[in-house]
Amino acid sequence: INNGNYYIEPTKAFVAIDVNTASDISFAAGLKANLAMAKDLPRQLRLRGLGGQIVIDPAPIPKRDRKALERALKAAFRKDTVETNFVGWTAMGLLELQRARNRPNWLNL
């Protein structure tokens, strides 16, 4: 993603997604990086065959911008064929999703 990056790390417990903004730590850069991740995430999860519990650690954004991130993620996942449910935000500002597993993930092949 432009002006940032994100990492997808499958663990035994869940899939962790960490979004970073590189050197720009402004809220605007955080929102931009999070929205770019939201558009790309369904494709990346599908390519890797990842599902189950997914926890996103977004780049820092104000609470008022959380709805914009949720809308972007929901729009992106609506276009995807794998069922994905939004669980909600944790007290620590992480976003939880639940995604159906429709095939073995690429790490287990």
Question: Positions of the model-derived regions?
Answer:
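Conserved glycine-centered short motifs in functionally critical loops
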Residues: 2-109
